[in-house]
């Protein structure tokens, strides 16, 4: 089989729809087109049965009750519904203080900022240099009026896995609603909501080989969590989220979560071996740094800073590799990654970082090609860099006084 270029190594931005998922979706576009809310004929019943089967499949991956799964348009909407919905519902009884983390996805940070505009107070926690949250720092941030805490399961840029079980225990003990953004976690880490003390959890399909435009929010029933709806209309999804359900998208999400449950253990082994091969192949390039803890991390992610190479010029030089610097949602801006800044990386190293994310359809041949290409291009770009020359001459660049410009 000949290798196709460019090589896709950006699975954390999105994944291709697995052909098995696409095949399952197609009948619900044409023949089974009924509205799942149509209760009076078989077109509606067939669609409704498919929606409920998918709800069971999503619940099964995370060991939840299907009744706790609410369909949304994606993880961004789930995050908005969870944070705005819970904070507003409980503000009068619990308080108006929210805790989150500086390395969260923009869908969390911007939602919390919006809550601040509405009169809530927020604490944005620092992480350690390895990207992980210190539990003591989290505990210290809790106030009597803390209503909600939101911490992501797996970071989208550096792939580190936060200590969700421990954080859940702390929140439950203090009576704080605990929300977790698990967009990057499904199919990568085991999630057991019968054990985790998590009240709200956001999911989407397109990071797990399903279609874009569909997600879900887990809303715990015992103890019961209440939310204020953010989307008003026909009262679908038990009033949490109005709007006609997109049966084909939902079927796709159900199927991709079903496959994830079946194949996750094997896939993580294979993907982890490819990631380790990539890391080993790049470690002998001088002045490279891995961003984020390597043990508490999903198998799919490798984020490396190549010192003295500008991230943007690097991406141009390796255009045969589809990779990103920073996350897809913010990589259009030339600002250095706020996640890497929060890990204590300086602007230069944050700017020279590349995120490689590997997935279901990545081959060993592609990884070999990537290693070879990176060795060539990093060398070439550094030859053009006056900073590299100074570094090689033993000059400590942090002591250089640059003229203002």
Curated annotation (Swiss-Prot):
| The EC number(s) this enzyme carries | 2.8.1.7
GO terms assigned for molecular function = 2 iron, 2 sulfur cluster binding; cysteine desulfurase activity; metal ion binding; pyridoxal phosphate binding
Entries under Gene3D superfamilies matching the protein: Aspartate Aminotransferase, domain 1, Type I PLP-dependent aspartate aminotransferase-like (Major domain)
Keywords, A to Z, come to: 2Fe-2S, Cytoplasm, Iron, Iron-sulfur, Metal-binding, Pyridoxal phosphate, Transferase
Active-site residues, as the UniProt record annotates them: 329
Reactions performed catalytically: (sulfur carrier)-H + L-cysteine = (sulfur carrier)-SH + L-alanine
Q: Which residues bind [2Fe-2S] cluster?
A: 329
Q: Which cofactor does it need?
A: pyridoxal 5'-phosphate
Q: Spell out the GO cellular component terms annotated for this protein, sorted alphabetically and separated by semicolons.
A: L-cysteine desulfurase complex
Could you tell me which residues carry N6-(pyridoxal phosphate)lysine? 207
Which NCBIfam families does the protein's record reference? Answer: IscS, PRK14012.1
What PANTHER family has UniProt attached to this entry? CYSTEINE DESULFURASE (PTHR11601:SF34), CYSTEINE DESULFURYLASE FAMILY MEMBER (PTHR11601)
Q: Can you state the subunit structure given in the record?
A: Homodimer. Forms a heterotetramer with IscU, interacts with other sulfur acceptors.
Q: Which family does it belong to?
A: Belongs to the class-V pyridoxal-phosphate-dependent aminotransferase family. NifS/IscS subfamily.
Q: What does this protein do?
A: Master enzyme that delivers sulfur to a number of partners involved in Fe-S cluster assembly, tRNA modification or cofactor biosynthesis. Catalyzes the removal of elemental sulfur atoms from cysteine to produce alanine. Functions as a sulfur delivery protein for Fe-S cluster synthesis onto IscU, an Fe-S scaffold assembly protein, as well as other S acceptor proteins.
* Annotated protein name in UniProt: Cysteine desulfurase IscS
Q: Give the gene that encodes this protein.
A: iscS
């Amino acid at each position: 089989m000949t290798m196709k270029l460019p090589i896709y190594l950006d699975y954390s931005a999105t994944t291709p729809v697995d052909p098995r998922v696409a095949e399952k979706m197609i009948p619900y576009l044409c023949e089974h087109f009924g509205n799942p809310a149509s209760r009076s004929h078989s077109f509606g019943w067939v669609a409704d049965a498919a929606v409920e089967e998918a709800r069971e499949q999503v619940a099964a991956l995370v060991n939840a009750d299907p009744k706790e799964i609410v369909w949304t348009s994606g993880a961004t909407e789930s995050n908005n519904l969870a944070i705005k919905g819970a904070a507003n519902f409980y503000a009068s009884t619990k308080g108006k203080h929210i805790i989150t983390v500086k390395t969260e996805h923009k869908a969390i940070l911007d939602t919390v900022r919006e809550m601040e505009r509405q009169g809530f107070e927020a604490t944005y926690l620092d992480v350690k240099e390895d990207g992980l949250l210190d539990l003591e720092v989290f505990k210290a941030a809790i106030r009597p009026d803390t209503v909600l805490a939101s911490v992501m399961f797996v970071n989208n840029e550096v792939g580190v896995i936060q200590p969700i079980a421990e954080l859940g225990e702390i929140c439950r003990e203090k009576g704080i609603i605990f929300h977790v953004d698990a967009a990057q976690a499904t199919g990568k880490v085991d999630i057991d909501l019968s054990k985790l003390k998590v009240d709200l959890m956001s999911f989407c399909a397109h990071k797990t080989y399903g279609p874009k435009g569909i997600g879900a929010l887990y809303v715990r029933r015992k103890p019961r969590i209440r939310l204020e709806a953010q989307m008003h209309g026909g009262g679908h999804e038990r009033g949490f989220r109005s709007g006609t359900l997109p049966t084909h998208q939902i079927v796709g999400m159900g199927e991709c979560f079903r496959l994830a449950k079946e194949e996750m253990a094997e896939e993580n082994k294979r993907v982890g071996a490819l990631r380790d091969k990539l890391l080993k192949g790049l470690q002998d390039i001088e002045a490279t740094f891995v961003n984020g803890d390597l043990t508490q991390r999903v198998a799919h992610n490798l984020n490396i800073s190549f010192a003295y190479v500008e991230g943007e010029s690097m991406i141009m030089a390796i255009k045969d590799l589809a990779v990103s610097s920073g996350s897809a949602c913010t990589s259009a801006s030339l600002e250095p990654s706020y996640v890497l800044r929060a890990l204590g990386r300086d602007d230069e190293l944050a700017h020279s970082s590349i995120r490689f994310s590997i997935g279901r359809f990545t081959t060993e041949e592609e990884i070999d090609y990537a290693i070879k290409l990176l060795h060539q291009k990093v060398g070439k770009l550094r030859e053009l860099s006056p900073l590299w020359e100074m570094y090689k001459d033993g000059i400590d660049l942090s002591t250089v006084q640059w003229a203002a410009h």
